[in-house]
């Protein structure tokens, strides 16, 4: 029973972003460009990614 995993990499800085976008990056466990996290795919995570889609790169694993 393996769930899909997503590798989320922050590619841009949060300088100039809104408070909501900064909070979302922090909630994802990111903080600086080129940091990445591996998370299980779910609708909640997809919503967070949509908020900061211009700041991150997402790859399926």
From Swiss-Prot:
GO terms for molecular function: structural constituent of ribosome. The keyword Transferase does not apply. One of its GO terms (biological process) is translation. Keywords: Ribonucleoprotein, Ribosomal protein. GO terms for cellular component: cytosolic large ribosomal subunit. The lineage of its organism: Bacteria, Pseudomonadati, Chlorobiota, Chlorobiia, Chlorobiales. Part of the 50S ribosomal subunit. It comes from Chlorobium phaeobacteroides (strain DSM 266 / SMG 266 / 2430). The keyword Transmembrane helix does not apply. InterPro entries: Ribo_uL30_ferredoxin-like_sf, Ribosomal_uL30_bac-type, Ribosomal_uL30_ferredoxin-like. PANTHER family: LARGE RIBOSOMAL SUBUNIT PROTEIN UL30M, MITOCHONDRIAL RIBOSOMAL PROTEIN L30. This is Large ribosomal subunit protein uL30. Belongs to the universal ribosomal protein uL30 family.
């Amino acid at each position: 029973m393996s769930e899909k995993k997503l590798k989320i990499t922050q590619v841009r800085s949060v300088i100039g972003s809104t408070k909501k976008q900064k909070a979302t990056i922090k909630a994802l466990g990111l903080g600086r460009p080129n940091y990445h996290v591996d998370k299980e795919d779910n609708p909640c995570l997809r919503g967070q990614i949509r908020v900061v889609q211009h700041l991150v790169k997402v790859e399926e694993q």
